[in-house]
């Protein structure tokens, strides 16, 4: 069970697909009691497979991860790729081992990141790529003929946890226009709000905001101009205008 459990449940019911919705203990017991050859496919969940399951000779586990491992192991990798202004990002299918996102790579797919992409739009693109990659590799996985690539742990980055956010969720007015754009788009998970609302400080007051707009245009104002008016904060810098709206004073 995970944050997407309601969506998955509705999808299964709509398409008449049998499903089980189990808590962690029940799921672990289910896996431990399996005695036939089993392939477990892990997609977008928080469940960490214990060694008691991974050590069973009849069980293999593959996992979909939203990054080009060994970059960005852990949670919300798409946000970090955007925030860090990566030019290329992608997905990985890999075997599961005890160390999070450290198993041998089965396949990867990549795409170029544009200055318009958000975490939400990247997730949608990843879903399509992950399915296409799965179709390509599933036969090899079942036949155990995959030519895997072992990860280079010298290139492995620190694990990102679910509570971590780009710059702790705070917009920094000292950033360049490119950095502001990257931050806004990284925090943007649309209706999912995976990282919560971003915020900024203005005149000693903390504001959260739920909407933004990025406009690329020639500006006659000095770089770094800030204006708070009609519940909107406008930032003009380096021929970009950032409009932050639906502001509310944070507690």
Protein language model features and the residues they cover:
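Short, structured protein-protein interaction patches enriched in aromatics and acidic/basic residues
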Residues: 197-211
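One-carbon transfer enzymes
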Residues: 1-194, 233-244, 249
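Low-complexity, glycine/alanine/valine/leucine- and proline-rich hydrophobic stretches
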Residues: 213-242, 249
């Amino acid at each position: 069970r995970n944050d997407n459990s309601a969506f998955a449940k509705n999808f299964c019911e709509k398409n008449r697909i049998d499903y089980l919705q189990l808590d962690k203990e029940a799921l672990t017991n289910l896996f431990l009691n399996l005695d036939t050859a089993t392939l477990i496919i892990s997609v977008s969940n928080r469940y960490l497979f214990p060694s008691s399951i991974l050590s069973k000779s009849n069980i293999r586990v593959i996992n979909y991860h939203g990054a080009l491992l060994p970059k960005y192991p852990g949670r919300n990798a798409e946000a970090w790729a955007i925030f860090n202004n990566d030019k290329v990002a992608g997905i990985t299918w890999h075997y599961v081992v005890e160390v999070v996102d450290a198993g041998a790579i089965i396949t990867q797919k990549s795409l170029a990141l544009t200055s318009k992409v958000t975490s939400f739009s990247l997730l949608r693109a990843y879903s399509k790529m992950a399915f296409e990659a799965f179709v390509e590799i599933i036969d090899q996985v079942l036949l155990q003929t995959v030519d895997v690539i072992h990860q280079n742990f010298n290139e492995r980055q620190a694990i990102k946890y679910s509570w971590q956010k780009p710059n702790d969720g705070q917009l920094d007015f000292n950033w360049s226009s490119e950095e502001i754009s990257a931050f806004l788009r990284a925090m943007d998970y649309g209706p999912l709000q995976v990282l919560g609302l971003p915020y900024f400080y203005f005149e000693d007051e903390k504001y959260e905001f739920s909407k933004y707009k990025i406009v690329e245009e020639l500006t006659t104002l000095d770089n770094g101009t800030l204006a708070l008016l009609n519940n909107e904060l406008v930032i003009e810098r380096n021929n970009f205008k950032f409009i932050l709206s639906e502001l509310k004073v944070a507690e």
